[in-house]
Amino acid sequence: LILLILTIAKIFLSPVSFYTSIKSPVGLSLFSSFPMSLIMISVWMKELFDKANLYFWVAGVVIQTAILIIFTIKYVFNFRIKYVFPSWFMVYAGLGMSAINCKDFGMDIYGKAVYFYTIFISIIMVIPILTRFFKRDTTIAARPLISLLAIPFGIILPAYIGLSPSVSTNSLWLMFMGLQAILVFVIINMILHLFDGFFPTWSCYAVSVAIVAYASKFFLAYLLGHKMGSDIITYIIYGEYVLSFIVGAFMLLASFISILEDPEVHRQRVMENTQKLNLLE
């Protein structure tokens, strides 16, 4: 919630800087984390705002849809393979977050439609994204983006549990194991590139680990609800919570250190990082 407030403050207090940060394919796609977070926390906001928490959910859906439309017009209708990054998952699969908690707002039919859309669009995007990332040169600044491969599974698993009339335990286990494999890959990738220098894309590691932990929470709840839980799985998922906190705190600290450096040095470094990501049009 604090990070959401800071993002809103940046939009109003520094609109030029905000616009500069989202006028590129990577910047705009990563901004999808804002509406995705709104959708995620909307259920938790019920304690503070009662039924008015619906407005958080609707705002998240509307903003995410707007990003999807703008992104499609700018970067799909004018397609260039150099602008294809794993962050596209946040734009096109991000709307699936609303399928996870749609039942809390009586939007079951909408949620099922978005759920199937998320599966369909994720399958379509996997090949071009992986082809672009592994077959073409990738800058150091763009390497953390590969961690966003966790987004589709991290959204589809909890949505499947919440919306499917008959849940297949085998399918759940396959998705859960897939998430664990991606998590291991993300952590290894993060460690290997930890000393490459700080880039804003480091936040992708935190997003990735967090969404794995978020999805695993639903998996654990399902197992416990059907009396299939085990201490090992419980410890693994609790470990993911701790890991999510550590990675998130580390990335936040690195970001603050970067921001608090000399303003001119920071401005120059931001420009250099932007150029490395091929964000300048």
Where are these regions (language model features)?
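Aromatic-anchored, glycine/proline-accented short structural segments
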Residues: Y117-F176
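Juxtamembrane helix-loop boundaries in multi-pass membrane proteins
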Residues: S14-S42, W57-G60, I73-I100, Y115, ...
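Helix-coil boundary and interhelical linker segments in multi-pass alpha-helical membrane proteins
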Residues: W44-L54, I100-K112, Y160-S171, F219-Y235
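Alpha-helical transmembrane segments in multipass membrane proteins, preferentially the mid-helix core
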Residues: I67-F71, I100-N101, I124-F133, I155-S164, ...
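Long, repeat-rich segments with strong aromatic
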Residues: I161-G197, W202, I211-F219
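An N-terminus-focused feature that recognizes amino-terminal "leader" regions
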Residues: I2-P25, S255
